[in-house]
UniProtKB/Swiss-Prot annotation:
Pfam families named in the record: Octopine_DH
Family: Belongs to the lysopine/nopaline/octopine/opine/vitopine dehydrogenases family.
Enzyme class: oxidoreductase
Any one GO molecular function term: D-octopine dehydrogenase activity
Catalytic activity: D-octopine + NAD(+) + H2O = L-arginine + pyruvate + NADH + H(+); D-lysopine + NADP(+) + H2O = L-lysine + pyruvate + NADPH + H(+)
Protein name: Protein ocs
Signal peptide limits: none
Keywords in alphabetical order: Crown gall tumor, NAD, NADP, Oxidoreductase, Plasmid
Length: 358
């Protein structure tokens, strides 16, 4: 069995660790950056955790490593499980090590192939970078219970370098269900659909959040359906960018159906009825990753790429403007844009190559 290292100690990291432990009998190493060890330290105090899944579960003992070098030593697959905001800092830490015998997996990815190309030392770069559109699970931790609320029937991945069938097989077995391979990491970047529903949903919830209304309705049950017209408009603009760049993707609703199944006939019905999302709380503050990450670090870049290739995205722009007003920050200036990635003035081909980690 290929050794696995997990970087991050949040919901996804612990669910992946519990899944590997209970399904495959494997104990991956877990490391978290010193600057963000709240969950890591909680787990250390708890000791043993319990995976609670729809088909299997049980107790498992996470192997926590304080030292990054120890955590990744001998790992065939190194999983980067932190949100976009935390990826760059970890990549800078990884740049100190020889990764040439490992595959780095961004779960999920967010232009991670590009970030690796710009950050890691070429001589010691990983065999390949794999990016995914999403997590394999809907999940969260409640104290010592790691809840695998839903297991996706598949999820999409792409690699910067061709992988042998043997390596692909060792990668695929790490998940409950096999992933679907896309041709380009650039397609993965535009198929991370968090910026489609999250920003529109939290902006719809703004009055309830800022007025402190209690109890606040559940995020996916109430606020995303309330904003569904905007969600669909953003999704259509996303696919227009994808088409213009010659990449592949699907609608947000198509992904939801493919991942989770169910009988929903449209996006609104899915968000209102999918049990895996039913208890997800609405954020308590507007200063939340649905804006500070999904807008500032992904949607802003979508908008700038759209402008560079001549695609009109008025709904995306309106969300960026509204998020800027809420955060009292001009996200088009402070967010992750083409210039900050050294892609100012780049054409469509150069943008795709960069997102592919070339």
């Amino acid at each position: 069995m290929a050794k696995v290292a997990i970087l991050g100690a949040g919901n996804l990291a612990l669910t992946l660790a519990g899944d590997l432990a209970r399904r495959l009998g494997q104990t991956p190493s877990i490391w978290a950056p010193i600057s963000n060890r709240s969950s890591f330290n909680d787990v250390r105090c708890l000791g043993s955790l319990e995976l609670v899944g729809p088909d299997y579960g049980g107790d498992f003992q996470p192997r926590l490593e304080d030292d990054l070098g120890t955590a990744i030593s001998g790992a065939a697959f190194i999983f980067l499980t932190v949100p976009t905001l935390g990826q760059q800092g970890i990549l800078r830490e990884l740049a100190k090590f020889n990764l040439s015998n490992s595959v780095l997996v961004a779960l999920p990815g967010s232009a991670t192939s590009l970030a690796c190309k710009q950050t890691l030392v070429p001589t010691f770069a990983p065999i390949a970078v794999i990016e995914s559109t999403t997590s394999p699970y809907a999940c969260r931790r409640v104290k010592a219970r790691v809840l695998m609320l839903g297991v996706k029937a598949t999820f999409e991945v792409a690699t910067t370098q061709p992988l042998s069938e043997e390596v692909k097989g060792r990668f695929e077995v790490l998940f409950p269900n096999p992933p679907q391979w896309y041709q380009h990491p650039a397609s993965i970047f535009f198929s991370n659909t968090n910026p489609v529903a999250h920003p529109a949903g939290i902006l719809a919830a703004r009055d309830s959040i800022e007025q402190g209304i209690l109890p606040v309705p559940k995020f996916y049950r109430q606020f995303v359906p309330q904003a569904i017209t905007r969600v669909i408009a953003i999704d259509e603009e996303r696919l227009s960018i994808v088409d213009a760049l010659g990449l592949e993707s699907e609608t947000d609703f198509s992904y939801s159906k493919k991942w989770y199944g169910g009988h929903a006939c449209n996006a609104r019905e899915f968000y209102e009825t999918y049990e895996g999302y039913a208890e997800i709380e609405t954020p308590k503050t507007m200063n939340h990753r649905y804006l500070t990450e999904d807008v500032k670090h992904i949607l802003v870049l979508w908008v700038e790429i759209a402008e560079a290739i001549g695609v009109q995205v008025p709904e995306m722009k309106s969300v960026v403007q509204e998020a800027s007003d809420v955060l009292n920050e001009n996200l088009l200036r402070t967010g992750r844009g083409l210039s900050s990635l050294n892609l100012g003035g780049a054409n469509a081909n150069a943008i795709v190559r960069a997102l592919n980690g070339v």
